[in-house]
């Protein structure tokens, strides 16, 4: 019997059903899903922040209706057509399925990170953002109005900037990683400075992960080629050996309530498994190949611990525009979804009902929480056919085995205007939006050319990168890069 052909990860037939796609007119730099409501917030390269509310039930129904209609008309799967079978909207929109709750010019320059308050007593009530302007702001999620803010320039060294935010799940600690490898800690109540951990990494901090089961003061960070375990009061607890590959993101798995097992994504297209109880996180224990042609830029736990398969899984987004579900117990990719052929996956989140949210600089997709009935039917059919063929071929002893497949919110009044942060009446930064946006676009255009050569040397190339569609806007010149380096100069 012939050996099954091994499929390339990039040629796997994508699975899953998107129910919503939001297309952005300016590069998306950060996105976050609300932990308890159907809301997501987007931070853009221009410094704007948008808050949208969606009706997931209507989106699911509309997607299913389109699929059923296509199947009724042509007796074929909707996935065989070139048309989208999900809802597509612009970033500012008001429909029955999705509305823009508020929008504002929150920062001068890019908005680099957005984050909802995860503390149980105030979960989702507050939104934290940080921009290129070195200002951290805390706002009311419902209205968008700023409650407090702080300029952290005094805490940064020359030519340093914040890349990533992280919040303790139990204490008012807001952590920020910087381009120079430091971690700054603020009191999230009033944004006063509390701690500073210097030289955690030699280069930018790519990701920060809280360790609530260990201590509210303990966190993991990745940056450059190392993983560090830090105590925000005392400094570095341990730092891993040099992995000789850039570490970009990480996640605990849902079935580990001790924060012991952590999965780490690499620039070389792999995911590695680490255990604190084995070797104090000094080195990886094993690795899982995901996509050798791309970098694994972002990772998040599947979170749904009610399902054994999902409880052992993480989602990984890569620079080829693919999203892979990796089961660490099986040591392999068990599902692959296509976010976009011309948009790298730089952001992942899980909404309040365990729906996957994927995003790149151009668009965001929200995926159905329901299983893919078509794929299950097709899979059963293929298995049946293969079984019959196998029986027939076994009699002849010469057959070859066929290749296997390894809530709706009300439309609130718009709060955008010509002034920065017009949504909040207390903010005194009054610059015209048109002037600020024009400056942002010039900065983006100028920096993109400067960074292009640098990125070419460090990033694995997508097979379709040279044929990416050209957009008729200034921001189309912005080059993509893996990890936190997409922020270079912005």
UniProtKB/Swiss-Prot annotation:
Sequence ranges of Polar residues compositional bias: 450-461
Chain positions covered by the region annotation Disordered: 368-490
Compositionally biased intervals (Basic residues): 469-484
Main location group: nucleus
A single GO cellular-component term on record: nucleolus
Basic and acidic residues bias (residue ranges): 438-448
Any coiled-coil regions, as ranges: none
Domain of life: Eukaryota
Record has Disulfide bond as a keyword: no
Subcellular location: Nucleus, Nucleolus
InterPro entries: WD40/YVTN_repeat-like_dom_sf, WD40_repeat_dom_sf, WD40_rpt
Gene Ontology biological-process annotations: positive regulation of transcription by RNA polymerase I; ribosomal large subunit biogenesis; rRNA processing
SMART domains named among the record's database cross-references: WD40 (SM00320)
Repeat (WD) residue spans along the chain: 23-64, 70-112, 118-155, 157-196, 242-284, 286-327, 340-377
Full protein name: WD repeat-containing protein JIP5
Organism: Meyerozyma guilliermondii (strain ATCC 6260 / CBS 566 / DSM 6381 / JCM 1539 / NBRC 10279 / NRRL Y-324)
Gene: JIP5
């Amino acid at each position: 019997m012939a050996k099954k052909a091994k499929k390339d990860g990039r040629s796997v037939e994508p699975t899953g059903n998107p129910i919503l796609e939001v297309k952005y007119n300016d590069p998306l730099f950060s996105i976050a899903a609300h932990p308890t409501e159907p809301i997501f917030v987007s931070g853009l390269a221009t410094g704007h922040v948008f808050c949208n509310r969606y009706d997931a039930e209507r989106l699911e129904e509309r997607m299913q209706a389109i699929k059923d209609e296509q199947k009724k008309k042509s007796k074929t799967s909707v996935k065989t057509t070139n048309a989208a079978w999900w809802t597509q909207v612009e970033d500012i929109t008001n429909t029955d399925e999705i509305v823009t709750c508020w929008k504002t010019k929150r920062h001068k320059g890019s908005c680099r990170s957005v984050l909802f308050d995860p503390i149980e007593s105030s979960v989702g009530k507050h939104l934290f953002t940080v921009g290129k302007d070195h200002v951290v702001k805390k706002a009311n999620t419902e209205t968008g109005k700023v409650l407090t803010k702080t300029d952290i320039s005094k805490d940064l060294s020359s030519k340093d900037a914040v890349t990533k935010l992280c919040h303790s799940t139990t204490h008012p600690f807001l952590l920020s990683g910087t381009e120079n490898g430091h971690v700054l800690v603020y009191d999230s109540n009033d944004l006063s400075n509390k701690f500073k951990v210097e030289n955690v990494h030699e280069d930018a901090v790519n990701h920060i992960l809280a360790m609530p089961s260990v201590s509210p003061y303990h966190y993991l960070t990745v940056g450059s080629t190392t993983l560090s375990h830090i105590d925000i009061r005392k400094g570095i607890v341990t730092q891993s050996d040099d992995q000789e590959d850039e570490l970009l993101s990480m996640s605990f798995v849902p079935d580990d309530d001790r924060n012991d097992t952590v999965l780490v994504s690499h620039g070389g297209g792999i995911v590695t498994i680490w255990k604190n109880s084995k070797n104090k996180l000094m080195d990886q224990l094993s690795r899982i190949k995901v996509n050798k042609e791309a970098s694994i830029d972002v990772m998040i736990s599947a979170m749904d611990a009610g399902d054994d398969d999902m409880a052992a899984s993480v989602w990984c987004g890569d620079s080829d525009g693919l999203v892979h579900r990796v089961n660490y117990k099986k040591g392999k990719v068990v599902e692959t979804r296509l976010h976009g052929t011309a948009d790298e996956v730089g952001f992942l989140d899980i909404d309040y009902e365990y729906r996957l949210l994927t995003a790149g600089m151009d668009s965001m997709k929200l995926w159905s929480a329901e299983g893919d009935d078509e794929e299950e039917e097709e899979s059963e059919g293929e298995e049946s056919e293969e079984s019959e063929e196998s029986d027939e071929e076994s009699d002849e002893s010469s057959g070859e085995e066929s290749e296997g497949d390894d809530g709706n919110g009300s439309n609130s009044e718009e709060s955008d205007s010509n002034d920065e942060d017009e949504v909040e009446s207390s903010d005194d930064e009054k610059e015209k939006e048109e002037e600020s946006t024009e400056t942002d676009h010039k900065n983006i255009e100028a920096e993109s050319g400067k960074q292009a050569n640098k990125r070419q040397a460090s990033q694995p190339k997508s097979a379709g990168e040279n044929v990416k569609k050209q957009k008729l806007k200034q921001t189309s010149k912005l080059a993509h890069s893996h990890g936190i380096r997409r922020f270079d100069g912005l």
